[in-house]
Amino acid sequence: MKNIEERIKKIIFEKLDIKQEKIFNDASFIDDLGADSLDTVELIMALEEEFDIEISDEEAEKINTVQKSIDFIQNKNLKK
């Protein structure tokens, strides 16, 4: 499952232009990583594309930290 974590952190690094060493699992996209609402939408879209999944608006609202995105993707992959 480490591969999922690495892929998600790479997306965050690319989309938010943040040094990878600052991307911790408990980091909030908005509070800790400085993302705005548009950034979070772009992150969700990038996750959908990277992992070939659909994330509903309701689900997207709950994905507000690095760890929550990892957990969500892992759970989606288990259901495939």
Swiss-Prot record:
O-(pantetheine 4'-phosphoryl)serine, modified sites: S37
One GO cellular component term noted in the UniProt record for this chain: membrane
Protein's UniProt keywords contain S-adenosyl-L-methionine: no
GO BP, sorted A to Z: lipid A biosynthetic process
Domain Carrier: 2-77
Primary localisation category: cytoplasm
PTM per Swiss-Prot/TrEMBL: 4'-phosphopantetheine is transferred from CoA to a specific serine of apo-ACP by AcpS. This modification is essential for activity because fatty acids are bound in thioester linkage to the sulfhydryl of the prosthetic group.
Keyword Lipid biosynthesis included in the entry's annotation: yes
Family indicated by similarity: Belongs to the acyl carrier protein (ACP) family.
Described function: Carrier of the growing fatty acid chain in fatty acid biosynthesis.
PANTHER family: ACYL CARRIER PROTEIN, CARRIER DOMAIN-CONTAINING PROTEIN
Protein name, entry field: Acyl carrier protein
Organism: Buchnera aphidicola subsp. Acyrthosiphon pisum (strain 5A)
Organism classification: Bacteria, Pseudomonadati, Pseudomonadota, Gammaproteobacteria, Enterobacterales
Name of the gene encoding the protein in the UniProt record: acpP
